[in-house]
Amino acid sequence: MKVIGLADSELESSLRKAGIGMSASEARSIASILGRDPTLAELFCYDAMWSEHCSYKSSRAVLREFLPTEGPNVVLGPVEDAGIVSIDDEWCVVISHESHNHPSQILPNEGAATGIGGIVRDVNCMGARVVATADPLRFGDPYGRESSRVRWVAEGVVDGIWQYGNALGVPVIAGDVVFSRCFDYNCLVNVVAIGVVRRDEIIRSRAPPGSGEKGYDVILIGKPTDSSGLGGVIFASDTLREEEEEANRGAVQIPDPFLKNVLFKANEDLFRLVREKGVEIGFKDLGGGGLTCASSEMGAAGGYGMEIDLDRLHVAGEFPPEVLCIAETQERFLIIAPRELRERILKIYNEDWDLPNVYEGARASVIGRVTTHDRYIVRHRGEEVVNVPIKHLTGGIRYERVWRPRIRNLVEPDVRMPEDLNRVMLDMLASPNIASREHIYRYYDTEVQGNTVIRPGEADAGLLAPIRERDFGIALSVDSNPFYGRISPYWGGATAVAEAMRNVAAIGATPSTLTDCLNFGNPEKPEAFWEFRESVRGLADAARNLWLKGHPNQPVPIVSGNVSFYNESPEGAVDPSPVIACVGIMRDISRAITMSLKEAGDGLYLLGPRFDELGGSEYYRLIWGVTGANVPVVRFPLERSMIYTVIDAVDREILRAAHDISNGGMAITAAEMCMLSDHGISIDISDLGDMRSDKLLFSESSGFVVEVADGAEQEFVSIARSYDLNPVRLGSVSTGDIEMARDGKMLVRLDPEEAREAWSSGLREAMR
């Protein structure tokens, strides 16, 4: 394709007509390295590999500057498809975190389903058994001007998740959902998957040592390549425009969970084979960027070149080479293995698991070899259509983006004290951002595989016991508050980390690792890039200062993640949304607790003082229609002490329930603890300071409300004081109403059934 000698305007026009999204300057740099005009297939390969989605060209420098990725428990950091941390000397947890935002806005069902499909492949290709997923979701205002579209997107996304996940046989154990007008035209569908693997059975997504010298086979398994998902990574690296919606539908992949299930079982046989033979293979899923991305990254990661013959691909029709290179056909993996295993591997997939009869055209095919040269070469019909330096293709391109603070001119509102706090409580409990998520997770199979200990909705985090003969469990939580990010991207990032860790601690697990999915607007706009940079700085500071328990000054490592830019439409960008997942390890699952109250007469305690921090709160937004300015901040020593106190108290079996304070503040937190129990509460906030009562009740400053077992209150106070905390006794669990008083005056008295009806119906009504 002509590049050299064309004016910028001519070149840009030529690239767009060909369906290529790169800039003229990027095309020129490719031609300069090659010393010639690139072929059309080469430009398509570079377009995918140099997309924001694949190359991290805007974000990589910021991530490297701030994020802590190492730790004593880290087995594999964020260098491959998933991160790995140790559970004990034998077992490891594998975790990956991705986004599928643009596809889910265009085709909600297919977009969400393929998001799940891609993330579980990332975990499986490390040699792991996939044991759970989580789904942090962000939708538009269900009562706003785009309500019909918002509800259509939300319903489709939820359907896609449960239809794919249930058929695949992987439980959803965690998730959250936020509704806001900023997501009207750009929903966020983030997905997390975790798996378990023995430390000595980990498989890497790279060409193994010696594979180039020995000419290892490159084997493609799964669905026949078609044109589905073509240009998906380019589509994900641009702003959404309504007038282009129909044209973009082809960039959304087509899922098949039944085939995926069969592939996972066949993969287990592959893993068993390589263990028996004592050989190392490379194994990688085909996701964004398709065959080109998977094969070139595996070769480059091993320090080798790669030769691919497209005529050997199993395909679903006649397609030009550029389509075969970058199509994102789902349910595919790539294997790099010794030639002496070729027939055994082909037999596993084509005969033992009979892929051709499971899905028409599916199979395993040898499509190339690893080489010792430094080139990435692709042939089609006997001719070279791609011949480029493999490190140049995979190394991407880097931009030093300009950043400039966004000025919002936010102020604290002067609102009056509500006359009827009962009404305020009921309205907040019914808010779609607080109400029960049962309307969503009732569709999910949360107990498939039989390992789930704590299900969605029962606690702040999910918990599973993936190894039957062992006592340990894996906890998972996902969190982010875009309303905080709107006020302060820095504190939005920091609070997301803190809340994710609090949620894991609330069941008694110790935070072990973090992942991030960073959802922002157009990085070419200085204000948007500043929001990204500030959020990363905030979450990194939280990870560095909250520490791995038992390892002072050691950050909680961030071992996996994703950056999703261009979550923007002509109507505007999403609020800064750094979604954090936290994995915790529970040494003895029999000690885990939930958030529902257990025994009348038990003491209720508050950990964490209340501050005048209602900026971005549900109270301000829902009741008064304002954002505010005083966003919650993370006081790192205080936060660390609260988390450690709860973990230790659960371990000593003196807490019966715990719930972290977040959306809605202390009052909503305490009321939610009644929702899944037959109990009420009687609390008094007289000793919490001199702030106005509504601010004390609804401030979203971090903390916990905990139920302390009768007779164990002194021991709990002693634990808290050992961490320099002064817990406040709020009151006790009762058999009556939800009561909150101050200085002898009853502020709130709710019938638990009335409160439960508001809480259980809010999300159902919003998505009706």
Curated annotation (Swiss-Prot):
Residues involved in substrate binding: 99-102, 121, 253, 328-330, 564
GO molecular function, one term: ATP binding
Record keywords, A-Z: ATP-binding, Cytoplasm, Ligase, Magnesium, Metal-binding, Nucleotide-binding, Purine biosynthesis
Binding-site residues for Mg(2+) 2, renumbered to this chain: 122, 285
E.C. code: 6.3.5.3
SUPFAM superfamilies referenced in this protein's UniProt entry, alphabetically: FGAM synthase PurL, linker domain (SSF109736), PurM C-terminal domain-like (SSF56042), PurM N-terminal domain-like (SSF55326)
Protein origin, superkingdom: Archaea
GO biological process: 'de novo' IMP biosynthetic process
Subcellular compartments: Cytoplasm
Residues that coordinate or bind ATP: 56, 516, 561
Pathway annotation from the record: Purine metabolism; IMP biosynthesis via de novo pathway; 5-amino-1-(5-phospho-D-ribosyl)imidazole from N(2)-formyl-N(1)-(5-phospho-D-ribosyl)glycinamide: step 1/2
Enzyme class, UniProt record, top EC level: ligase
Residues the record lists as binding Mg(2+) 1: 98, 562
Main location: cytoplasm
Known catalytic reactions: N(2)-formyl-N(1)-(5-phospho-beta-D-ribosyl)glycinamide + L-glutamine + ATP + H2O = 2-formamido-N(1)-(5-O-phospho-beta-D-ribosyl)acetamidine + L-glutamate + ADP + phosphate + H(+)
GO CC list: cytoplasm
Active site (catalytic residues): 53, 100 (proton acceptor)
InterPro entries: PRibForGlyAmidine_synth_PurL, PurL_linker, PurM-like_C_dom, PurM-like_C_sf, PurM-like_N, PurM-like_N_sf
Quaternary assembly: Monomer. Part of the FGAM synthase complex composed of 1 PurL, 1 PurQ and 2 PurS subunits.
Family assignment from sequence similarity: Belongs to the FGAMS family.
Job description of the protein: Part of the phosphoribosylformylglycinamidine synthase complex involved in the purines biosynthetic pathway. Catalyzes the ATP-dependent conversion of formylglycinamide ribonucleotide (FGAR) and glutamine to yield formylglycinamidine ribonucleotide (FGAM) and glutamate. The FGAM synthase complex is composed of three subunits. PurQ produces an ammonia molecule by converting glutamine to glutamate. PurL transfers the ammonia molecule to FGAR to form FGAM in an ATP-dependent manner.
Protein name in UniProt: Phosphoribosylformylglycinamidine synthase subunit PurL
Classification lineage: Archaea, Methanobacteriati, Methanobacteriota, Stenosarchaea group, Methanomicrobia
Gene responsible for this protein: purL
